[in-house]
């Protein structure tokens, strides 16, 4: 699996946004992990390659990726019940001593 090559344009679409919450901050400090919202069809190897491509200037090395599907919540619209859309999130473990700086993102220049 490590020998796979991915389309850089696809990798730039895999990670949608960082998940910023109290729980995400706690996990980040305690376990050296970052939580991202990812595309619904993203796979673990794609997420790993996307993180390493986007933050290649910082030489970030991903140790592991765990992916979870989050169900949408049921919400009431007046007297009708509706459902918000579900989404997928990825827990990215990076090597000890490394951190991701969100202000230094490369645009995925491939040579």
Swiss-Prot record:
NCBIfam families: PRK05738.1-3, PRK05738.2-4. Pfam families: Ribosomal_L23. Keywords: Ribonucleoprotein, Ribosomal protein, RNA-binding, rRNA-binding. This is Large ribosomal subunit protein uL23. One of its GO terms (molecular function) is rRNA binding. One of the early assembly proteins it binds 23S rRNA. One of the proteins that surrounds the polypeptide exit tunnel on the outside of the ribosome. Forms the main docking site for trigger factor binding to the ribosome. The keyword Ribosomal protein applies. The lineage of its organism: Bacteria, Pseudomonadati, Pseudomonadota, Betaproteobacteria, Nitrosomonadales.
